[in-house]
Amino acid sequence: MKNYKFTISFVGTNYSGWQYQPNVPTIQNEVEEKLYYIVNKKKPIKQKIRAIGCSRTDKGVHAIEFVFNVKMEFDKDLNFLRKALNSALPKDIKIHNIEEVPLEFNSRFDALKKTYIYKLFFDEKNSPFFQDRAMLVYKPTDLGKMMEISHLFLGYKDFRGFTKELEDENGYCSVENITFKVDYPLVEISITANRFLRYMVRRMVGTMLSYAQGLISIDDVNDFLKAKRVSNHTAKAHGLYLKKVYY
């Protein structure tokens, strides 16, 4: 038995996230199904395939770099496996690299930090080109205000105010940096942290956006950051990309 690390990218538009769900298309469903067929072909005893993903992604979220690992027996060239998988998988999922790693490697728990990017497209003409690749923004927005409050999210803080609901679980995350890449009308916000809670990036971006549109005050933002209440200002899933996983 060996452990293999897979590095992939995908367009999440047609999938209900990474994690397996019965009767709905997910990235995990696709890679496990195709991998099972390839590694067990012409073998009398079939081995079970279980892919451990580096992160759960929501429906519609994309990945520039996503990592999963699989423990299995495989006696052929890994480049052959990569090519075979890419031939079998849908065109919106791409395998970039496969490598053998130590048996104890776990793509989820061994990740030191991750970088997500969020794409905003400030669109007054309803462009069709970014419909599923960025959040289209129609309301007047002060981009300077978004940048101005982004520093409030930096550091080691309790981010339960930016997740699904206030819970007793550990909500502390260390946000290392937040940067803006402006190529108007497209704006990319990059956020790096040691860990992320569910909806955290989307609600951080949605909160910054609402503040920049005058919908909420700085006091509201501070309340969310103190976990006094949960922000319901959630940016669309299809603007979010997992960019990099660090080990």
UniProtKB/Swiss-Prot annotation:
CDD domains associated with the record: PseudoU_synth_EcTruA
Catalytic activity entry: uridine(38/39/40) in tRNA = pseudouridine(38/39/40) in tRNA
SUPFAM superfamilies documented for this protein: Pseudouridine synthase
GO terms assigned for molecular function: RNA binding; tRNA pseudouridine(38-40) synthase activity
InterPro entries: PsdUridine_synth_cat_dom_sf, PsdUridine_synth_TruA, PsdUridine_synth_TruA_a/b_dom, PsdUridine_synth_TruA_C, TruA/RsuA/RluB/E/F_N
GO biological processes: tRNA pseudouridine synthesis
Alphabetical list of NCBIfam families matching this protein: hisT_truA
Protein name stated in the entry: tRNA pseudouridine synthase A
Originating organism: Hydrogenobaculum sp. (strain Y04AAS1)
Lineage: Bacteria, Pseudomonadati, Aquificota, Aquificia, Aquificales
